[in-house]
Amino acid sequence: METHATTILAVRKDGIVALAGDGQVTMGQTMIMKHAAQKVRRLHDGKILAGFAGATADAFTLFELFESKLKEVRGHMVRAAVEMTKDWRKDKYLRKLEAMLLLADREHILVLSGTGDVIEPDDNVAAIGSGGPYALAAARALSRHSGLDAETIARESMRIAAEICVYTNDHVTLETL
């Protein structure tokens, strides 16, 4: 799936998880529509962080579905993600949604792909969106070769992604657990 207009990054280090997202919304390939969109939010009484990349309406549909699954499984993020992706794969309308979610709680970081996969990274760093590869590379390097904390790694990695990706800006929303 091709995603534009965003970078979402999660970093866990020393027991802290940070989830960051830029604020740019791009219409097509030629126009920036918004600079300060909120693509990162807290779910389940603030215990889970979530960010999205892709079509906004589709992402909100996925947020709603995920939140309903969270309630069903009493806040267990991994189980809710797996249950949601089962529905995602089975439902012919959900399969057409063009969005991805990046989820984090104190123990796990998960990517829910546009094809209904649940992926947990090996190295406590994950990113989605058009600037995701740049933010991911920066975050991995900073995690491995610096004494920076999760929040600083996330902010600096997002700054680097914004310098490279034309669909990402430096208006960053960052949440931590």
From Swiss-Prot:
It is an enzyme of class 3 (hydrolase). The active site is at 6. Na(+) binds at residues 162, 165, 168. It is found in: Cytoplasm. GO terms for cellular component: HslUV protease complex; proteasome core complex. The keyword Metal-binding applies. Allosterically activated by HslU binding. GO terms for molecular function: metal ion binding; threonine-type endopeptidase activity. It catalyses: ATP-dependent cleavage of peptide bonds with broad specificity. NCBIfam families: ATP_dep_HslV, PRK05456.1. This is ATP-dependent protease subunit HslV. It comes from Desulfovibrio desulfuricans (strain ATCC 27774 / DSM 6949 / MB).
